[in-house]
Amino acid sequence: MYAIIKNGGKQYKVKEDEVVKLEKFDLGIGEKVEFDTVLMGQTAAGEVKIGAPTVAGAKVVGEVVEQGRHKKVKIMKFRRRKHSMKQQGHRQYFTAVKVSSISL
């Protein structure tokens, strides 16, 4: 059983009892979160439901387990023949959610 949800302009494939790192949102650790924008899902019986654009009445419930930052991504701009370069780093914030139930 799985579902494809939309969060923060991105799509994520989630399964029950799986921890997923999503875009950061302001909730404390241990709080419940509910996603209503389920784009597609598969039931335990194997039936696939596709939304247009979302599956009606479907929702994914999870619990926040961690707030953190990803590893650093280095951005480097190099100007050829000028002996000049610029280096910059970025660490994106995330919220880790453990999916507790999927209902389609």
UniProtKB/Swiss-Prot annotation:
Paired cysteines (S-S): none
Alphabetic keyword roster: Ribonucleoprotein, Ribosomal protein, RNA-binding, rRNA-binding
Gene Ontology biological process terms from the UniProt entry: translation
InterPro entries: bL21-like (IPR028909), bL21-like_sf (IPR036164), Ribosomal_bL21 (IPR001787), Ribosomal_bL21_CS (IPR018258)
Entry GO MF terms: rRNA binding; structural constituent of ribosome
PROSITE patterns per record: RIBOSOMAL_L21 (PS01169)
GO cellular component, one term: ribosome
Pfam families, sorted: Ribosomal_L21p (PF00829)
Zinc-finger listed as a keyword: no
Top-level taxon of the source organism: Bacteria
Function: This protein binds to 23S rRNA in the presence of protein L20.
NCBIfam families found in the cross-reference section: L21
Subunit note: Part of the 50S ribosomal subunit. Contacts protein L20.
PANTHER family assigned: 50S RIBOSOMAL PROTEIN L21, LARGE RIBOSOMAL SUBUNIT PROTEIN BL21M
Family: Belongs to the bacterial ribosomal protein bL21 family.
Annotated protein name in UniProt: Large ribosomal subunit protein bL21
Naturally occurring in which organism (per UniProt): Francisella tularensis subsp. tularensis (strain SCHU S4 / Schu 4)
Name of the coding gene: rplU
